[in-house]
């Protein structure tokens, strides 16, 4: 294990291109340990989720097939999708204006989830869109975190701050619209686990590697966000600690969004359609 840690640490050192003095806030050994164990943890979570889902699907084969949920076409869905698409495009322009390194920030969850929600809001492939939504609904926690503690220090270009808030409020609204007007899913633990497993691997594998290559702090994988009075969170364990906190919170908040969206659907849409 010690040799493996050394090899991974040296690999990170060889591909890294620092542009900030905090680039090595965590040691190469710390990065290597977390790269191995956190990715293993999230792979196990995905494996459990997939197997639970297979078991659930097998059990459902024996039951009568439910009547498919009705999709209520909504102009609001299209408006929110267009807003998200425009925001992603504007963010890409902003990043390109700052140089090739900054373009890697397009991997940030807000931009990826914006693209996913655009697809879910507009796709004609209802069944696949439903599965994608079952996974992506739990990422609303990232949106909430960004709105509660917005990091606007680097947003200096015209309209960039406004664009940030417009995008994130659209991201906040989108899951409720998708639940109320389109998919009306239920909380399913297998999909919740797959969701969090993918989220974790995107950080501790994909973001980790691209952070070293570009030198940019994608979703704070190199060094912590400005935490103010909570400076004790900036110790070496901040990534692991926040990862597990988000893991638990995402399941609870995702479930709450499902319940609220279903309530909106049953209270307003179904009653209005029955009149």
Curated annotation (Swiss-Prot):
It is a multi-pass membrane protein. GO terms for cellular component: membrane. It is found in: Membrane. The chain crosses the membrane at residues 32-52, 74-94, 102-122, 135-155, 157-177, 193-213, 240-260. InterPro entries: TMEM164. Its main location: membrane. Keywords: Membrane, Transmembrane, Transmembrane helix. One of its GO terms (biological process) is positive regulation of ferroptosis. The keyword Translocase does not apply. Pfam families: TMEM164 (PF14808). The keyword DNA damage does not apply. Belongs to the TMEM164 family. Positive regulator of ferroptosis. This is Transmembrane protein 164 homolog. The gene is tmem164.
């Amino acid at each position: 294990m010690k040799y493996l840690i050394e090899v991974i640490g040296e690999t990170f050192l060889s591909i890294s291109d620092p542009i900030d003095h905090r680039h090595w806030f965590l040691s190469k050994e710390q990065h290597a340990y977390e790269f191995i164990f956190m990715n293993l943890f999230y792979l196990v979570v995905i494996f459990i989720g997939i197997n639970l889902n297979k078991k659930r699907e097998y059990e459902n084969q024996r039951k009568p097939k439910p009547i498919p949920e009705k999709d209520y076409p909504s102009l609001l869905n299209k408006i929110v999708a267009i807003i998200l698409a425009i925001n992603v495009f504007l963010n890409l322009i902003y990043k390109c204006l700052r140089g090739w390194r900054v373009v890697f920030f397009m991997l940030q969850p807000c931009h990826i989830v914006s693209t996913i929600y655009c697809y879910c809001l507009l796709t004609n492939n209802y069944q696949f869109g439903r599965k994608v939504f079952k996974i992506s609904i739990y990422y609303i926690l990232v949106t909430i975190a960004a709105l509660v503690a917005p990091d606007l220090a680097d947003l200096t270009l015209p309209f960039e701050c406004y664009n940030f808030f417009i995008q994130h409020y659209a991201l906040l609204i989108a899951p409720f619209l998708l639940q109320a007007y389109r998919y009306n899913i239920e909380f399913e633990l297998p999909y919740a686990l797959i969701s969090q497993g993918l989220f974790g691997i995107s950080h501790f594998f994909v973001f980790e590697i691209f952070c070293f290559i570009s030198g940019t702090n994608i979703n704070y994988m190199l060094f912590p966000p400005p935490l103010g009075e909570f400076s004790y969170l900036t110790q070496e364990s901040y990534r692991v600690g926040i990862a597990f906190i988000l893991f638990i919170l995402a399941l609870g908040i995702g479930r709450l969004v499902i319940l609220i969206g279903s309530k909106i659907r049953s209270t307003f849409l179904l009653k209005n359609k029955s009149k």
